[in-house]
């Protein structure tokens, strides 16, 4: 059991911390994406700095990191003969590790993204209805206001609310609520700009005062 937990934690962190946005900046423009735009390695900053194509690739990659972390955790736990309850808890554990790994990658001095896409990935793997509902809320707010951070926060709130009211397994509830709160926490600077009316819309440049 202990070896399974260690293996799952290491693999989930390795997957979650894979720096897709950083590598896109290095490969396409020879830049450190952390020194451009908002300083995030996530798809939104990649969109701002590198354009739509690279941003879409990074977004999909970051989603897949979350999906693969959950799938791998289930596979490792199942191979070791663990019962369904233990598998569910280990899958949720891997999901949380992957989400945190995305935003705190050791390879980049713990400066990553805001874990939105990776959170979506783990939710799609663990609770597709909640994951798709959160993504739907994100798309709706994005379409109405063209502010990515507002959509991300709305999606996180939607996930939290649904996990509280729907009959989801306890491990999924804890993962969903924790990841939702974490995503909102990672958007602290965005919330400050939203309150001041300074948060950029898609296509607008971010102020140098982050």
From Swiss-Prot:
Its EC number is 2.3.1.275. GO terms for biological process: phospholipid biosynthetic process. It comes from the Bacteria. Its main location: membrane. It is found in: Cell inner membrane. It is a multi-pass membrane protein. Pathway: Lipid metabolism; phospholipid metabolism. Keywords: Cell inner membrane, Cell membrane, Lipid biosynthesis, Lipid metabolism, Membrane, Phospholipid biosynthesis, Phospholipid metabolism, Transferase, Transmembrane, Transmembrane helix. One of its GO terms (cellular component) is plasma membrane. The chain crosses the membrane at residues 1-21, 53-73, 87-107, 122-142, 147-167. Belongs to the PlsY family. Probably interacts with PlsX. This is Glycerol-3-phosphate acyltransferase.
């Amino acid at each position: 059991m202990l070896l399974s937990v260690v293996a799952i934690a290491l693999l989930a962190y390795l997957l979650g911390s894979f720096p897709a946005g950083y590598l896109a900046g290095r490969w396409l423009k020879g830049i450190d994406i952390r020194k451009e735009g908002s300083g995030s390695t996530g798809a939104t900053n990649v969109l701002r700095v590198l354009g739509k194509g690279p941003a879409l690739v990074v977004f999909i990659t970051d989603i897949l990191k979350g999906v693969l972390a959950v799938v791998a955790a289930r596979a490792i736990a199942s191979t070791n003969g663990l019962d369904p309850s233990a598998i569910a808890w280990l899958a949720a554990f891997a999901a949380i590790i992957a989400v945190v790994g995305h935003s705190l990658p050791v390879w980049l001095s713990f400066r990553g993204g805001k874990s939105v896409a990776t959170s979506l990935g783990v939710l799609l793997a663990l609770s597709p209805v909640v994951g798709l509902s959160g993504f739907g809320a994100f798309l709706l707010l994005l379409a109405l206001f063209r502010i990515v951070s507002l959509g991300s926060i709305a999606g996180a709130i939607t996930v939290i609310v649904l996990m509280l009211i729907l009959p989801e397994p306890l491990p999924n509830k804890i993962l969903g609520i924790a990841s939702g709160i974490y995503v909102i926490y990672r958007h602290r600077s965005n919330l400050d700009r939203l309150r001041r009316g300074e948060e950029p819309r898609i296509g607008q440049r971010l102020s140098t005062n982050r």
